[in-house]
Amino acid sequence: MKLQKPKGTADLLPAETAKWQYIEEIARGVFNDYNFKEIRTPMFESYELFSRATGETSDIVTKEMYDFEDKGGRHIALRPEGTASAVRAYIENKLYAPEVVKPVKLWYDAPMFRYERPQSGRLRQFHQFGVECLGLKNPAVDVEIIAMADTLFRQLGISGVKLSLNTLGDMESRKAYRQALIDYLTPFENQLSEDSRRRLNENPLRVLDSKEAEDIAIVKNAPAILDYLNETSKAYFEEVKALLEALNIEYTIDSNMVRGLDYYNDTIFEFIVNFDGKELTVCGGGRYDGLVEYFDGPATPAFGFGLGIERLLMIAEKQEINFIPEETLDVYIAVMGEKANLEATKLAESLREQAFKVERDFSNRKLGAQFKTAEKLGAELIITLGEDEVRTGQIKVKHNQTRKQVETTLQAVHESFAPIFEEIYADEIN
């Protein structure tokens, strides 16, 4: 049997995980600056949670969800997106309670699963940063979260990221727009794709999100939601735009944007990058004020986004941004002879307890081969430990680049290596 990873998945080897760790560290710092707290939810949940949250007519439910019946007869689905799980956790753990400070600001970094045709930047197991802000409705909340995504792109050095903005209005506005859209699309019903014909009367806004060529041509001239906003929705959107302008965050209005999920209302947005001549969405989200209540929680306004990490890395590579920090090792211990093995183990642990990054040889190779390994690992200092060093307790600590060396004792290293480290680097500091 040939063992290989499932189609649409990827192995992240050490060279790649170093990039991921760098991005995750930057993201964690940005989210912390905005006072968001990390949440971790199960990788699988009840199928109904996702089907109800994302919409029965959405592509996620009809085409992409990984679902199965477990041994207890429960209908389970692998998580296709993070918002539904965060909302479920918010309700189940009573984060809506009056003693909990509002808004509740949550972020996560998690794998998601969708059965899609694998291609560049789109895998069946992919990873997202997600943020959810629950408990307050204010245009400033929307803009703060959009600004947070913008800050993350800037701190990562990603350029050419453009903000696309729209509003879906409140329930009253959407109802008026829904009817206008049905009236417009009905004469074209026979020209629409099969999926769009099915969605026409169930959820006509989904037609605007279609990627089929025949649908794109028809919706190009469809009425815009902006023409059907009531005064409340219009005023809300105007304030969102004014706040973005106050922060010097440029945006364009895309009146056909609806996002791929059914739970959005009012502000929605996407951050888009031109990638090989095509527009690639790297981050998207919006307001979802009815979702908590839809799942029998209290009425709770909310706003959030998801950001694809694989796509972020793909864009960074295209823009020649190096996310791999230079790997260095403080100390490499070259070991010669069986009698030095025990002392090398003790020495390595002692140095690590003193907060130095250490590697040692385990193969009892010739010194030349060990020194080459130290070079490959980027070791700053080398300690050679043989049977003579163990017997006398005298050792030499050598700088791998300058070749400067200091003679000392094993006991001194165990007691405190920092002064020895500083002595070797004294000439560089001066």
UniProtKB/Swiss-Prot annotation:
**What protein am I looking at?**
Histidine--tRNA ligase
Stated family: Belongs to the class-II aminoacyl-tRNA synthetase family.
Q: List UniProt keywords, sorted A-Z.
A: Aminoacyl-tRNA synthetase, ATP-binding, Cytoplasm, Ligase, Nucleotide-binding, Protein biosynthesis
**Gene that encodes it:** hisS
Q: Which cellular components does GO assign to this protein?
A: cytoplasm
Membrane spanning stretches: none
SUPFAM superfamilies the record matches: Class II aaRS ABD-related, Class II aaRS and biotin synthetases
Q: Which CDD domains match?
A: HisRS-like_core (cd00773), HisRS_anticodon (cd00859)
Q: Is Cell wall biogenesis/degradation found in the keyword set?
A: no
Give the EC number: 6.1.1.21
Reaction(s) this enzyme catalyzes, per UniProt: tRNA(His) + L-histidine + ATP = L-histidyl-tRNA(His) + AMP + diphosphate + H(+)
EC supergroup of this enzyme = ligase
Annotated GO biological processes are: histidyl-tRNA aminoacylation
**What GO MF terms are annotated?**
ATP binding; catalytic activity, acting on a protein; histidine-tRNA ligase activity; transferase activity
Keyword Nucleotide-binding listed? The answer is yes
Compartmental location: Cytoplasm
A Pfam family this protein belongs to?
tRNA-synt_His
